[in-house]
Amino acid sequence: MAVPGEAEEEATVYLVVSGIPSVLRSAHLRSYFSQFREERGGGFLCFHYRHRPERAPPQAAPNSALIPTDPAAEGQLLSQTSATDVRPLSTRDSTPIQTRTCCCVISVRGLAQAQRLIRMYSGRRWLDSHGTWLPGRCLIRRLRLPTEASGLGSFPFKTRKELQSWKAENEAFTLADLKQLPELNPPVLMPRGNVGTPLRVFLELIRACRLPPRIITQLQLQFPKTGSSRRYGNVPFEYEDSETVEQEELVYTAEGEEIPQGTYLADIPASPCGEPEEEVGKEEEEESHSDEDDDRGEEWERHEALHEDVTGQERTTEQLFEEEIELKWEKGGSGLVFYTDAQFWQEEEGDFDEQTADDWDVDMSVYYDRDGGDKDARDSVQMRLEQRLRDGQEDGSVIERQVGTFERHTKGIGRKVMERQGWAEGQGLGCRCSGVPEALDSDGQHPRCKRGLGYHGEKLQPFGQLKRPRRNGLGLISTIYDEPLPQDQTESLLRRQPPTSMKFRTDMAFVRGSSCASDSPSLPD
């Protein structure tokens, strides 16, 4: 790695990125810091991620996202991260780290770029390449050496305490030790590290045939499609007497996922600022969840349930369908000599009073709670259930229906009473335990034995089975498209389908083709 000049050395600012989840790799960090890395005239001087572990702090500091004010503590902190020291880096995180996290020492050019990087990413949530939130936050802090902060590196005089506390030369972490860290010495093919090297550098290496293919796979490099650079279209037009409104800069990943701010979100393992979990739960309860099914029927949802396509956006209005009929004069009729769909649906909706009824006096809680609602609401649901049973839309089998729901409250009471009176498992009943210890099996007895428990009577012998008549018509060839879609299923008792679903259709089961399907059905003699 080339030795930088003095001017560049003065402009270099070192920072520590801590709180990195161990599951993240360099490819994920490239996607996370892509917006800052690909900026023209900016970016990282070096960001080479090497999965350096860090220790969890004993106590969390309240404002650790800010720059620490004790430079001596930072120098002592970085002294633990030398290449010869195997102890992990100890950082002060704002959240109690429960999982293993890592850190990395990076460098940027100039104090302005360092402040911009801290403002963009420090305190934000971690995201992977798929946009999934990860526990913890990104914490970026400026790294200052003790000599750099005090400016008294060559001061010859020392205090009595400094003279008494002897320290070896190899224990003092200097700028030379900082430059020897593996994070600040990336390989030649990645001059700014596996995270900080922009895509244009890899493109130049590809043009020069110097980039191995494995680096593209490891870093998951995705190059933009070739096209015009749009040098003139990217220049904004400045209007006269225009005022620019400063807005908060949004940060995005390489996949276009927005990285949310970390000051208003609660961490997954624990709350960041020591807030009790009850307050966080109250804030979640105060949020409006109008799309949930259990919202007890607000005004707009109630209006939507009573009227079809209230906004006119679903385009469910009936199209004109003409069919000649024999017209019968009827009072209040349309007088048309042909049958229309609109006329049929208008008759289904009822008269004017029924169409304009708001039903505000109907208790809608019966649709959410089985035992809720007043008597009128429960009777309405019962009438709807009976109508569906008559139409065959509801399964009215008594066998499959659960019998004895009261056993949920009474099951096990008899056993508790007997155990209280001294009964144990495997003993008979009575004071002498002379009863049968086990209950009788309900399997019955031998089928040829015609008396006693388990005899069901004579078995009816059928004299003749009726043959199924053959179909005279040709068979209907079904296709996979005949199967109804999930949104076209029949309505349930307490919920209705959206107005876009198909209400009337002939259900035809799809039968996959076989060798027997090619044979044409033979006509009866």
From Swiss-Prot:
Any single GO CC term annotated in Swiss-Prot or TrEMBL for this entry: nucleoplasm
UniProt GO BP: negative regulation of RIG-I signaling pathway; negative regulation of type I interferon production; positive regulation of DNA-templated transcription
Molecular function GO terms recorded: nucleic acid binding
Disordered: region residues: 264-316
Cellular compartments annotated: Nucleus; Cytoplasm
Entry-linked Pfam families: G-patch
Domain G-patch: 410-458
InterPro entries assigned: G_patch_dom, GPATCH3
Amino acid composition bias (Acidic residues), ranges on this chain: 275-298
SMART domains, sorted: G_patch (SM00443)
Basic and acidic residues: bias regions: 299-316
Tissue localization of expression: Expressed in ocular tissues including retinal pigment epithelium, cornea, ciliary muscle and non-pigmented ciliary epithelium. Also expressed in optic nerve, cartilage, skin and lymph node.
The protein's assembly and partners: Interacts with mitochondrial MAVS; the interaction is markedly increased upon viral infection.
Protein function: Involved in transcriptional regulation. It is able to activate transcription from the CXCR4 promoter and therefore it might control neural crest cell migration involved in ocular and craniofacial development. Is a negative regulator of immune antiviral response, acting via down-regulation of RIG-I-like receptors signaling and inhibition of type I interferon production. The control mechanism involves interaction with mitochondrial MAVS and inhibition of MAVS assembly with downstream proteins implicated in antiviral response, such as TBK1 and TRAF6.
UniProt disease link: GPATCH3 variants may be involved in the pathogenesis of congenital glaucoma, an ocular disease characterized by marked increase of intraocular pressure at birth or early childhood, large ocular globes (buphthalmos) and corneal edema. It results from developmental defects of the trabecular meshwork and anterior chamber angle of the eye that prevent adequate drainage of aqueous humor.
PANTHER family given in the database record: G PATCH DOMAIN CONTAINING PROTEIN 3, G PATCH DOMAIN-CONTAINING PROTEIN 3
Entry protein name: G patch domain-containing protein 3
Lineage: Eukaryota, Metazoa, Chordata, Craniata, Vertebrata
